[in-house]
Amino acid sequence: MKKHNFSAGPCILPQEVLKQASEAVINFNNLDLSLIEISHRSADFVAVMEKTRNLVLELLDLENKGYTALFLQGGASLEFLMCPYNLLKENGKAAYLDTGTWSSKSIKEAKLLGDIDVIASSQDKNFNYIPKDYKIPEDINYLHCTSNNTIYGTQMKSFPKTDNLLVCDMSSDIFSRVIDFSQFDLIYAGAQKNMGPAGTTLVVVKKDILGKTGRKIPSMLDYQIHIAKDSMYNTPAVFPVYVTMLTLQWLKDLGGVAAIEKINNAKAELLYGEIDNNPLFEGAAAKEDRSYMNVTFLITDNSKKDRFDQMCKDAGINGLKGHRSVGGYRASIYNAMPIESVQVLVDLMQNL
């Protein structure tokens, strides 16, 4: 039976990427060696790292604009701490938008290092919307936001305007839509949504913003050290970086971010259309802030829930259960999710 994987992450990856990756685990580059047993400093893997870095900057339209791409470890969760370590000055202040669980966690970590001003929060309505009316302080070192909220199904459609540094956690929607990525001074994203398997974390940073905090930074948390060592200060996550390279090449061959955005819009509009037109379902997030990556919805007649769950199971649908803090259902429709799988879900909703 064909499976339809709506998991929030780790999540679906392109089938051709999985095939290439599995072959490389057995015999990488016709070396008669596995990808996961070669030296990370071999010419073959150095070429992988360089190609992956170049693909990131090309797909985000950040080539020759002063940015570099890093592949680190510790997930986006470690970036919650690395970001203030590298950007928050001694006795400085940063501003944060609180739009969900992950932004709340980033705030908690940043407060360990300095004065953090939470300038707006949607916690009053269980994070089901994106705050819009807030004032950005002038005396901050940076402003931090989270572009997409996997748990609650909200997504920022526009971003704050500030004369200070702008930082964005794009873990769950990077490479999914066309935006001006140059408005950000630092972007970070865990790989396990639109890039590859868990194990590496992408950081895209403007190099000239670093080294200005006046604080001592542990080596493993210092972006400048990782830049100087080409993301190899310690042994990199060889397999996740390689799969990320394959996924980004797949995206480039597809036509890049502009092409995948059209596909993503079609998938989301198909599913949201059914949610809005079917009285048995209702969306969990404010309509104007709905995520095109994580579609959260509720069933309005609980007497039909067990039947719907069984229908999904019989159809090979996986990973549809909503997060415990929201309940209901969450269909994660990342870049690699085919629209045919979304149609299978919509057909079930219509037949309930």
Which residue stretches match the model-derived regions?
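PLP-dependent aminotransferase-like
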Residues: 77-143
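Conserved active-site segment immediately N-terminal to the catalytic lysine
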Residues: 167, 180-192
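PLP-dependent enzyme catalytic core of the Aspartate aminotransferase-like
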Residues: 330-352
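Active-site C-terminal subdomain of aminotransferase-like
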Residues: 14, 191-272, 286
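Conserved PLP-binding catalytic core of the aspartate aminotransferase-like
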Residues: 281-311
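A glycine-/small-polar-enriched, mobile loop at the entrance of the PLP active site in fold-type I
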Residues: 2-53
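Conserved N-terminal alpha-helix of the aminotransferase class I/II PLP-enzyme fold
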Residues: 32-79, 86, 101, 109
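Active-site phosphate-binding strand-loop segment of PLP-dependent enzymes
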Residues: 9, 110, 121-174
